[in-house]
Design a protein with these regions (language model features):
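Alpha-helical transmembrane segments in multi-pass membrane proteins
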Residues: 8-12, 31, 35, 39, ...
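Conserved small/polar residues in nucleotide/adenosyl-binding loops
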Residues: 189-191
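Helix-loop-helix junctions within the multi-pass membrane cores of secondary transporters/permeases
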Residues: 94-179
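Alpha-helical transmembrane segments of multi-pass membrane proteins
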Residues: 178-187
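Hydrophobic, small-residue-rich transmembrane alpha-helices and their short perimembrane loops
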Residues: 53, 57-121
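Generic secondary-structure signature for well-ordered alpha-helical cores
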Residues: 16-20, 47, 83, 87, ...
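Hydrophobic transmembrane alpha-helices
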Residues: 1-74
Length: 191
């Protein structure tokens, strides 16, 4: 049953990640909606709504302007799922969401470096007039990277639990977290 629940959460996370990138803007990236869907599918709608509302408030307080903001949504989803699956209280979901958000931000920052290379690959394909390849890179490679950067951390953290998230977050050097914070802050002032 744990594996089935984990796979459900992974599918929700894929929908959440591809929402604004492929499906338009259906607001699947909002913790209130994501956690509510998680609660509904995992059999505890009340906890899903409560965690979603708490995380939505936290997200509104940390909303950034620009492309380098934090991904509180993945942390919210993981926290909600672990809370429902373990029967823990709502405060536990928030406690799990913070390190998961940090891990998610670091993973996305690294993925951004790879996505920049995709842009160069598209430019090179267009210069060679290989438009099919340029289209394939844009439509397949980018979303595939988003999905990979989502399913691996979500699956591992939900399946193995909060202890894994906490232990990984505690090993991250301070210079990495400081760099991520600096990058997010620079985007706020448009540098």
């Amino acid at each position: 049953m744990k594996l089935a629940y984990t796979l459900i959460v992974v599918l929700i996370s894929i929908m959440m990640k591809l929402d604004s990138r492929m499906f338009g803007r259906l607001n699947f990236e909002r913790p209130l909606l994501t956690c509510t869907i998680c609660g509904l599918l995992l059999g505890n709608l009340q906890v899903g709504l409560a965690v979603g509302a708490q995380m939505e408030l936290a997200t509104l307080g940390m909303m950034s302007i620009g492309a380098s903001g934090i991904d509180m949504n993945m942390g919210s989803l993981v926290g909600c799922a672990i809370c429902i699956m373990s029967g823990a209280n709502i405060e536990t979901a928030i406690t799990i969401a913070v390190p998961m958000t940090l891990l998610s931000t670091i993973i996305e920052t690294c993925a951004d470096v790879i996505r920049i290379q995709f842009t160069h690959m598209i430019d090179a394909a267009v210069e060679r007039e290989d438009f099919k390849k340029a289209k394939r890179i844009d439509i397949v490679y980018g979303p595939s990277l988003y999905v990979i950067c989502t399913i691996i951390p979500v699956f591992l953290s939900v399946y193995f639990g909060a202890d894994l998230v906490q232990s990984i977050a505690s090993v991250i050097p301070a210079w990495v977290t400081d760099g991520v914070t600096l990058g997010a802050n620079l985007s706020l002032i448009h540098i």
